[in-house]
Amino acid sequence: MIVLDRMKISFMLEDSNDNNNNNNNNNNSNNNNNNNNNNGYCDDSSATSSPTGQDSTIDRPNSPSSSIKFTYPSKNSIVTSPSSLQLPSPSFSSSSSSSSSSSSSSLSNKDLMEDGVILLSKIASPSKSSENSPTIHTSSLSPNSYHPYQKYQKPKLHVDHYVSNNNNNNNNNNNNNKKSDYSSELYNTSPSISSKTTPNGSSTNNSPFLSPRQPLFDHSNNNNNNNNDRNENNTTKQQQQLNQLNQLNNNLNSVNNSLFDYNGNSQELQQLIPSSPTRSPSGGSGSESEENDGESSPNNMRSLACNKHSKWKKKCPESCTGRLSPVEIPIATRKLWSQEECCRLLEMVFQRDPQSVTSKESELRWRSIASTLGRTVTSTRKKYMRLMNKWSPRPHCVHPISKLIDQNEKLLLLQTSTEAQQQVQQQQINLQQFYQASQQMTQNLPPQQQQYHQQQMNQQQQLSQQLSQQLTQYKQFQQQQQQNNQQFQQHLQLQQQQLAAQAQVQHQQAQQNLQKQIQQQQKQKPQNGNTQQNNKLKNQNQNQNQNQNQNQNQNQNQNQNYNQNHNQNQNQNYNQQGSNQYLSSISSYSNNNNNNNNNNNSSNNNNNYYNNNNNNNNNNNSNNNSYYNNNNGNNNNGNNYNNNYRSSLSPPHSPHESDRQSPQQKSNNENQQNFPKFRKPIGRPAQSCEAHRNEHQKCPPLCPNRPENLNNNNNNNNNNYNNYHN
């Protein structure tokens, strides 16, 4: 009963409604028989006579191919007596089968359980030892492999039909003889619909519809069981069945150990699963099937392929003339960088520094670095950039490559230091050996020559001592010179700082005095005796300049005295250089002071002019007017012409010049700033005066306001102004 329940679970059948739709010729009695057979029971009440002698078939609509029918025996094949209860083996019948007349072997009540066990053992562990093992042929290109680039299609299932019916023995024999010629084919699963596997690779699925390329029934055993006589002894049957069970178990173990071993070779699979001739979908010849059989898995796709088949990602078949030897094409793998290579790369880059030169030279340097490392330029540059981006900010104690670099540097320093020490020691040893050899030579010589030789040796020693003393003296002299140079530079810096501070103080005092004078002059009203005041101010400025010059001369004399005292302690060459530098620096500073004083004087004079021009006098002060190269608005000629060309000297504007001007003078300056319409650029002279320019004409040569005449007058005025200030 347990076995039949397992049969029920493995062969799930549908309701009687589906059975009535597929088989219109069945009666209610047949439907009852079907239900009883599904449950695995055969009661006497269900074993009634049926008017029709047909078999009851049940469809499996969920099968992956054409409809498979599981056939059960009819009423005629069942014996009512409990001692002779028979259960024939179930069989498949295809929908395309036309004849359904066959007979099945009847079993005794004792053999019922044994046949059930044999049936389930055959379903769970089919044998491979059978000669005529049924196979499945699909419409795919290669039956032994699954191609990843091909869309999966449902395979067409071709199953030989076996119908069990309790008719005449002659018909049974004839049908068995006919069906022995056909090749039975069963469903074969592709890798996409694979059974469940354990981590070791062994299959755990016992369903007959999902076991790969395994026959559901051993037809030779079925035929033998059908051909045997019913009156044969039960003992012989049991022995045969036990032997078959042992063989099946052994075959199952060998298949599970070899078929699902993923580390095994494909040759073992081919030996265990022999390939059968395929049916091409278009009905092609056998050569096409051989080419399709030549395909392999995508992992070893091009190992045995020529140029023709490698394009289509296929293996060369045995009939291919350009078949290659079974040598795998080597895959180009990247060579990893070791720590030593990285250190060497960084050292070479730091030494050659290819990034600090032009592009061509840097390319050559990168190429030389790459050639020494045995790599390409791009790989070396990429690795260098990665190293610098990753590892430059990390500390030395963390990164191993930085540690290696430090260790290499330390080793190099130790090697260099040890090499130098070894060289010194070797020199000392050589000298000692030389002295010893010379002493031995002198001992063999006569006494007179020995004395002469010793005298020479003593002289050489004295010379060497003198040279060493001279070297020490020279080193001491150099150190003293360096110290003297440092002291002299410090003294120069101090003097320059002092002079600069004094000059700043004097400049500030002069500015304060000027501001005081300006304020006093603004408070006083302008009078007719302005010329006398101008002369007094000029004399005062001259006296101030003379006093400043005297102070500068005194400073120069002091510096010269210091230089003379300093020169006595130094060598002549060094004293000359130092004194020249010092004098040049002092002279440049004095010149700057003179220029500043001159500028101050000129500004004083001009300020006096601006203050004295507050009166509406018509006197043309040629000196100050020529400095701006213009005429006052109150000239006797009445020409308000503004000359565009100023002298090279810039006017010394005081900080608040506009505040010191009278309102009338401000208005005159505003009128003068209104330049004419057609003013030309600064680099070219005007060709006409303002009156002729308004008429768009050139000035005639006798025009008093002609620009050439005005320029000549202005040049003369500028010369007079410069002579006056000098």
Curated annotation (Swiss-Prot):
Compositionally biased region (Polar residues): 45-80, 124-147, 183-209, 661-675
Superkingdom of the source species: Eukaryota
InterPro entries per UniProt: Homeodomain-like_sf, SANT/Myb
Alphabetical list of SUPFAM superfamilies matching this protein: Homeodomain-like
Location of region: Disordered: 15-109, 124-149, 161-239, 272-303, 516-726
Residues of the Myb-like domain: 329-388
Biased composition (Low complexity): 18-39, 81-108, 165-177, 221-239, 516-651, 709-726
Sequence intervals crossing the membrane: none
Protein's recorded name: Myb-like protein Z
